[in-house]
Amino acid sequence: MSTIDNLDAHTPMMQQYLKLKAQHPDILLFYRMGDFYELFYDDAKRASQLLDISLTKRGASAGEPIPMAGIPHHAVENYLAKLVNQGESVAICEQIGDPATTKGPVERKVVRIVTPGTISDEALLQERQDNLLAAIWQDSKGFGYATLDISSGRFRLSEPADRETMAAELQRTNPAELLYAEDFAESSLIEGRRGLRRRPLWEFEIDTARQQLNLQFGTRDLVGFGVENAPRGLCAAGCLLQYVKDTQRTSLPHIRSITMERQQDSIIMDAATRRNLEITQNLAGGTDNTLASVLDCTVTPMGSRMLKRWLHMPVRDTAVLVERQQTIGALQERYTELQPVLRQVGDLERILARLALRTARPRDLARMRHALQQLPLLRELLADVDRQPVQKLREKMGEFTELRELLERSVIDAPPVLVRDGGVIAPGYSEELDEWRALADGATDYLDKLEIRERERLGLDTLKVGYNAVHGYYIQISRGQSHLAPIHYVRRQTLKNAERYIIPELKEYEDKVLTSKGKALALEKQLYDELFDLLLPHLADLQTSASALAELDVLVNLAERAETLNYCCPTFSDKPGIRISEGRHPVVEQVLKEPFIANPLQLAPQRRMLIITGPNMGGKSTYMRQTALIALLAYIGSYVPAQKVEIGPIDRIFTRVGAADDLASGRSTFMVEMTETANILHNATEHSLVLMDEIGRGTSTYDGLSLAWACAENLANKIKALTLFATHYFELTQLPEKMEGVANVHLDALEHGDTIAFMHSVQDGAASKSYGLAVAALAGVPKEVIKRARQKLRELESISPNAAATQVDGTQMSLLAAPEETSPAVEALENLDPDSLTPRQALEWIYRLKSLV
């Protein structure tokens, strides 16, 4: 690529380009040239590959041809969306000078930088997902992590204590762009993530961070936000805010506060748990058959995003949860009236962000007006709901009568996409604008009359008055009649089948039309900008209203789901434990064609671990997952799929369910399983809900059994967590006899010949057998293989009839049967001293040992 070193050798235009490019060396530069954005040199080559557009040349500069690629300015959003989705950032360089008054290249400057984490344009965002920018910082005491959703102004920080917690946060928030310090030590934590941006160390400096944040919020200190004593989080937040200011190049009035997220405020779920429970993403990476796919019937995009945040951060404050439950109960008879009105509110949250950034388009203001028009009806529908939480939401919504009337007066009903197209401001809003428009419209009427007059006067039926951007207004006469044109008609352009002329009268009106249109458009832009100044003082109240509307949408949605799907309202208890009557899996019951078999569950301090046995495909994993999902739903304040639920305090949910090789990190299935198990054993508490499925697979039988036994023993005796422990090791069914607080349950099945019927019902006690061969037959394993397996099974059982009931002593961890007695031959050999034997004695010993064996 050509560089700034040999600047004088370039043309003036390329000198200007290279200076701007030097300020943004690592990102693509969209350089405005008339109706196109153009890219040069390496940017052009990269863009042609990323966007699949033609790579051409634009003349030469400094004696070298200039590689060039271009895109039309009116289609820029589509191309930006493609680049942002690929993790690219783009600097947008606009012409800010007037070509008519400029000598040499028109003045240009970068007006904004579009990055994956700072986009607010509607066309670039997925409407039902948060789009987060994040920053990560690390020192010897732990991590600092900050996230910002620029499309809502939601600014959060946290201080994860260890690597596992940090990994879980990255998975929960899934940022579109991640800023990290150039000396970041835990590179394996972030490698492979999209939108990584390396930043200099000084951007994470704590004093600069405090100064930046106080300046943004207009405060003297950060005590009021509860983040004063979170230095690592503040380092990350400071870098993040600086980056946003650098890229947006405008004030950020919608970012008004920062909130500390503390571990003790929410139920903690690690990365494996979020993945295994398929909350918003299934194991294949899609969104089908997830908890969100069943629960999310919200009618606004901002409500959908809020619901997903709730699902990923269940709260532990039962006062908040009971308020939500009361609201859901009160709205169950109202959702049919409320949802159609809420649907009209749309994505007010993101419209307000664009308003704050002054990038809102005319249609954003029209949508905002439409949203505000719904408030009186919503307030009326909620007025007689006798629940304090509902009335709180109603108050937060506000009315905004003046703003609504302002938008009704100022913006036409169906405005164009862009203000530069004109026709946005409504007639009657500005007298001066109406006058200029009348002049432009009057001149246009005159031109229509001129065409009729000239056609009749000259008797030329092909004569017509037209306009194009290059030649302005003209009179066109067909080639066949052009010889009849009067002498004062001055030829302006010759076409294949026609001639175009100009006359002084037409030129005079052209000037008048263009002047009046130009004046009207300039005034319209000015009035449009003034609308922002009138709306922005109310931004904080509008954001509060948008948040209340999103929450109302979520709660109305949960009321509808509870009613439609037959969910019950769970009750919270101070005592540890979970009691579920007729619990169901919220997703599986929707997918199944046949009725779902509901099952009970009881966990309490005296029954804190269930050893779950039963056949493969019998429903063990479903039973375990449904328990976790019912707990999760209860702790977002939702109703749950069961007949009755009572649930005690829960601080964490862990799942060790299913596994696959992590080939990218060089870890086998067994290694993945053991890593997840270690995390559980280190971090679970007596208030944790732990799901352990088939621990010990992937290694030898006795190794696996030993590990499973020791893990179960540790969870039951030492940690005392609420545990569901599914296993195929029947030896573990003896645990209830050796430890208090452990019970056996099994999933029932009936076997008839070579077939098996899964009953999917949970019964007390251990399963009688595994039904492995019946499941294999059901899976389509050839009959001769099944037949041979039955023979082998009988052989093994005859050799070791007690193998399945091996006595396992929990105190000694002797997982094999009691040691066998030493044979006489071995005893004789142990007492033998070979160095003292003569050759004859040695030979006699061989015969003697032979007889002992």
Curated annotation (Swiss-Prot):
GO molecular function: ATP binding; ATP-dependent DNA damage sensor activity; damaged DNA binding; mismatched DNA binding
One Gene Ontology cellular component: cytosol
Binding residues for ATP: 614-621
Keywords, alphabetical: ATP-binding, DNA damage, DNA repair, DNA-binding, Nucleotide-binding
Listed GO biological process terms: mismatch repair
Source domain of life: Bacteria
Pfam families hit by this protein: MutS_I, MutS_II, MutS_III, MutS_IV, MutS_V
Its job: This protein is involved in the repair of mismatches in DNA. It is possible that it carries out the mismatch recognition step. This protein has a weak ATPase activity.
Family, as annotated: Belongs to the DNA mismatch repair MutS family.
Name of this protein: DNA mismatch repair protein MutS
Species the sequence originates in: Klebsiella pneumoniae (strain 342)
